[in-house]
Amino acid sequence: MSSNHPLGGLDGIAFMKAVGEVREDFQFLVNDILLNIGNLSPLFIPVNKVGANARAALKIIDESYAKDIPILVFPAGLVSRKMDDGKITDLVWQKSFIGKARRYKKDVIPVLVAGENSKWFYNLSRWRTKLGIKANLEMFYLPGELFKKKNSTIKVTIGKAVSYADFDKSRNPNEWAMFMREKTYALANKN
């Protein structure tokens, strides 16, 4: 299952809740720092976002994909940003989930989570980028963004599965990732 990543925390919780209503046996590829959330760590597959993934970490990812369970991913790997046109959208989706879907014969279900962070969050991201600061400073403000959403409702829309067999040689993995990204954002027009 692949989803956009508009909120950076609450969207993951909403994603897990939506899937958990149908299946309890799932795992979620997440930033390895989230393993510190003890109650949720059994559901998490760690991904090192600041360095290279060690061989042992890659083995854990492959072992998880080999199981007959849903794997939840945010293919962008980072929280959505405000683009020059004013739209809140994910950055480029990484192709690895397409390769894993092919290798482990897992269909991919597009999931759209609605929502956005504060203007301050997006302004920080924009200024950091303009100033050439590579460190993802806005990540440190995501817990605050989560608490700003107190008493709000997060809408999660689940699309139709795309068979792993559809990810053929007619497109390269990057193009298939873009295809899934487009299918995900098209779910905004579903309701």
Residue ranges and their predicted role:
Residues 55, 59-191:
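Non-catalytic C-terminal accessory region of glycerolipid acyltransferases
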Residues 1-2, 110:
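Short catalytic-loop micro-motif centered on adjacent basic/acidic residues
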Residues 3-52:
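Catalytic core of membrane glycerolipid acyltransferases/transacylases, capturing the structured
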